[in-house]
Structures are given as structure tokens and as C-alpha cells.
Amino acid sequence: MAETVLLIGTRKGLWIGRSADDRKSWSIEGPQLPMEEVAAVGVDPRGGGNRTDGAQPGHDGVTPRLFAGSTNFAYGTRVLHSDDLGHSWQGVPEDAIRFPERTGNSLNRVWQITPGIQPGEVWAGVEPSAVFRSTDGGVTFTMNDALWDHPHRETWEPGFGGQAVHTVLPHPDDPEDALIAMSTGGCYRTTDGGRSWAPRSTGIRADFNPEGKKYPEFGQCVHKVARDAADPDLLFAQNHGGVFRTKDGGAHWDSIEPGLPATFGFPVLTDPRKPGTVLVFPLVADVERFPPDGAMKVWRSPDSGDTWEPLTAGLPQDGMYSAVMRDAACVDAGDPTGIYFGTRSGTVYASRDGGDSFTEVAANLPDVLSVRAATLG
């Protein structure tokens, strides 16, 4: 029977959920990293340092390597990894993910940790907006110079959460190709292994711009982007205002918000077992930022955003005013797909049937910032 490990990063530490019965019941452990803000958690299913056969990190490991990007407001920001499913954590060297002196900047937060497709490759999106890449399984990282030196940099402005790269999506088949998203700045894509980056936000709305300039080439406040399971050129973006779809890898985007109760939100997910299935978490905005009508509903589209349906089974439908942050939702590799999300009021919900029903697996935690699941067996 499949086991699942759920990483739950919060404003004040890391909690770990464990299920040994195909996600029917859960135990919650923590806090780990107490009083550290864990804005990013990640899973590399290829494994890491647990190998004993001489293979390097990232080479088809038996146990997934888990990651946490944490910020201690006294000691700074760091990346940790675990090769025993979160029972213990190892910090990388202090200078393993640091800005070069020439930038005049220091690392504020790690917002995204995700594996690439090359052996040992791990990507990190950080604040201020930059991308770091590791080739040794996430032990050491190197800043991408081309993005840091991009001529658009002086136009990128901080959103409410800071000026950061929060999404890194390596292409599943092409090691030279990756798409990133930042707030604010929009989406950028490299097709030459990071030697150059081109804006890929045409068609995404920037409501905060004056009339006549609401559809710029770059500069949008994109909140999150997800890639389709079957078509790598099909991506979905939850924007500061609106939900958008591209069928050409980001060259052009179209609105898919008709049918949703609100256009604001933070996360967007795709189902790895159902191509064309996308999920969002709408909020009324810009002033309130509450779930519409005080009811927690996940909205799912089975047809790439052409139509939408609310998912409510097991979720509170009255007096619910807590938001789901951009990285506080994820899917797993189970069958059927598991869907997980945590709220700013510290409650975590899980579905083991692709979103048809949810159960509460944790409550009364600090506000949840990041969630990732590792499936075993």
C-alpha cells in the first residue's frame, strides 16, 4: 500500500504529515525548524545522498530527497535537505546559495525548490528575483547570471510579498528549456539552458496599469504557473487579476476566467493523471481577499479552462475567510491523484480522489506557506 509524506511549511516552522494506508489516515509531526519561516518545500523523487552504490545525488534514488527553504530572522536564509523522509535535516554550507558580491544583494527568501531533468539538477527561485541551479542534488547552487543581468530588471517591482521568482518549471523533455514567473515581472522563458531569457507574458492582464497599457509584454503580477501533464506547451497562470492559458509555451495567453466566481487567487494546479485538468482557489479582491461568500471551494476544470465546477465535499461552506497562498497547494503522484492545500489559518486539507472530496488532516498550525507531497511505492 502506498505511503505518502506531506511537507507543510509554515510561518513558524515545518510540520510533516505521514500516511501509510493510501492516504486514508494521517499522523502529523512537528514542529521542526521552529520559528523559521519555511516559504518553500520541495521533493526530488530521484533521491539523493541515501545511495550506497557510488551514484551521485539525483540518480534514481530509492528514497526521495526532501528540501526546505527557511528563513530565520536572526541568522538568515538557508536550504536544507533530508534523505530519510524528514526524520532529520542537513543544512547546505553557508555560502552554498548566496548572491555573488558583484550584485550587492543578499538572499531574503527561497520561494521555490524544484528538481530538473538532468542528473543532480535542482532549481531554486529566490527573493530578490533570481534563479539558482544546483548540479549536485541541491547541496550547492550557482546563480544564473543572464537573468540577474536582464535589461528588464530595473522595471521589476515588488509585490506585497516581495520581488521574487516564485515559479520555476523545467521542461519535462528538453534540458535547455525552462519557464519562470515572478511578482512583479511576469513570465520569462529560456530555450538555451539559461544563457538568455525572453518575456512570455503577452495576453496576461495588468489591471494596475493605466488604460491602453493593461496588456504589456512584461511586468505583470503573475501569482503562479502550472504545466499540463501531457502537453508541455500548455500552461496555466493564476494572475493578480484573471486566470490565463497558453497553448504555445507562453508566447500568447488567453483568459479562461469565465465561469469562476472571482478572478483573484494565488495557487494553480494541474492533475498529473488527467491532462487538461486544472484547479484554482479564487478569492474576492483586491480589498477583501476572502473566499467568495465565506465558502471554501476549489474550482476544477476538466477541459483546460473552458468550463469550471466547484469542489466542496468536506470543505467548510460557512464562515470561512482564510486564503490559500501561492505554494500552499500541491498534487501527489498517487492513483487517483491526491490534492493538498493549507490555509493562512493553519488548516490543511487532503483529497485522495482528485478533488471529489476532502478531509481535514491538520489544524491550528501557523499560517501555511508551502505544501509538497512525496509518494512512496
Where is each model-derived feature located?
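Extracellular glycan-interacting surfaces
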Residues: 1-377
